[in-house]
Amino acid sequence: MARTSSLMVTSEAFPLAKSGGLGDAVTGLARALSRAGVDTGILMPAYRGVLDRVVGIRHIAHLAGMPGGEATLVGALCPESGLPFYLLCNPGLYDRDGLYLDEQGQPYADNAVRFAALAHAAMRVAAGLPGMRRPDILHAQDWHAGLVPLLVRAAGLRYVKTVLTVHNLAFQGSFELECAGQIGVPGAYCTDDGARLHGRINFMKAGLRYADRITTVSRNYAREIMTPEFGCGLDPLLRARAADLAPIPNGIDDALWNPASDPHLGHLCYSARNPARKSRAKAALQKAFGLHPDQGAALLAMGSRLTSQKMADVAVEALPDALHRHPSLQVAIIGRGERQYEIELEALAARYPGRCAVRIGYDETTAHRLHAGADMLLHGSRFEPFGLTPLYAMRYGAVPIASRVGGMADTIVDPGEREGSQAMLAATGILFDGDGAPDMGHAIDRALRLYAQPAIWRSMQRNGMACEFGWNTAAQPYLDLFENMVDAPRRGRVPAPTIRPAPLPAYARSSLDGMPAPAAY
């Protein structure tokens, strides 16, 4: 019997293209599914430089009549991940410096065309191309691939099932309705009962409306997005499709993120069996960031996008107070985002030389060494579908201080302040409610009180390092889902209500312009 085959349709996949956690998640899941016996491939754009990083390139098809002009589909192998890739080549659309944004940090004006072309390529594969197996499952990732289920439905391809995974509902791919003809979306689907939301064509809504099944990346986030507060205008549709929504938690690459063998750490590697060696990584981080060489200092790290979603506005208020109240506190920050927050954090570092350091930007080596050297990680967020960064921190013995939202409410164990210090012997981190500076500041204070109790702190570190968040665990629910979909007869068209959009939170209103969905670093 032939193996089940799935084709993941995505805008990015590590290591060929990555802007954030989406790229990590796609590759991590694809590798786990492949190990479990699913014939798994990845379809994505051939961005600048991608073809130089793959081997065994073979021509599959010339695709005429595509949004954005003629394109070529090639197959290749990525030697770093061991996965087969199918790359959509159209230099006019994809040969650019950035994946999604121009030099001014704005979404490319033709993002609707760029990612509609990707969806049309997936539909052509589903219809059948010589030299390429037709997949049983088309697995669309986030809004960039949101048109895939719609196009498969419109083409009447009943033998191919579609799944949409929502990584971040706040980023929806919303474009002027007038572009529908240009991107090949039939007018019958551009209605309030179809892909239209707020008078615009919405790629995420298209996926949610027409996918056979929907998944999202944590249990708590699945509950949240069915509420007006977190549903970003799509909660009525999500509630209508609740029976088709499966919360399947993400995983992390526990081989890549392993302090015992991390190539980014070199001689600084350590493990849960010899956590005392973490002190060497702490000393190295202090030296690299220009912090005072003090093993007794509590070293708090922050590594995320500097945006309102990630509560950078709260951090710039809470951290100065924390540094003032706690003379032994040190802070090391890496990240990039809104310039006003970058400036304020750089000013904070100038005010506290030797105790606070900020690196604007991001690179993998610094990120790994940040987790290795830190005692604790600050990860505030107004919404967080999953939350990879706190899991990386736990893996490296850095205790997370995080908002009680999304996936972090599922993955971080915190018995609560009312239970007393001894209850924290079973904890893996500290969670806080609210999005104000006092809320974050109180959580930092609480962490420092626990840090002053070595037995409790070491227990929290060990608990976090022992947690199993690898992709092999996350892959099994997808195996069950795919098996059920392939074996079961295809359902009839799922009715959806006429949507009366819920009021949008401010952060969501600013996110509906075709922006990418960059998850946490």
Swiss-Prot record:
Q: Which UniProt keywords apply?
A: Glycogen biosynthesis, Glycosyltransferase, Transferase
EC number(s) given by UniProt: 2.4.1.21
Q: Which InterPro entries match?
A: Glyco_trans_1, GS/SS, Starch_synth_cat_dom
Q: Is Transferase among the key words of this record? A: yes
Which residues does the annotation say bind ADP-alpha-D-glucose? Answer: 18
Acetylation found in the keyword field: no
Q: Which Pfam families match?
A: Glyco_transf_5, Glycos_transf_1
Provide the GO MF annotations for this entry.
alpha-1,4-glucan glucosyltransferase (ADP-glucose donor) activity; alpha-1,4-glucan glucosyltransferase (UDP-glucose donor) activity
Example of a GO biological process term: glycogen biosynthetic process
Q: Which CDD domains match?
A: GT5_Glycogen_synthase_DULL1-like (cd03791)
Catalytic activity, as annotated:
[(1->4)-alpha-D-glucosyl](n) + ADP-alpha-D-glucose = [(1->4)-alpha-D-glucosyl](n+1) + ADP + H(+)
Q: Pathway of this protein?
A: Glycan biosynthesis; glycogen biosynthesis
UniProt family annotation: Belongs to the glycosyltransferase 1 family. Bacterial/plant glycogen synthase subfamily.
As for what it does, the entry says: Synthesizes alpha-1,4-glucan chains using ADP-glucose.
The protein's name is Glycogen synthase
The upper taxonomy is: Bacteria, Pseudomonadati, Pseudomonadota, Betaproteobacteria, Burkholderiales
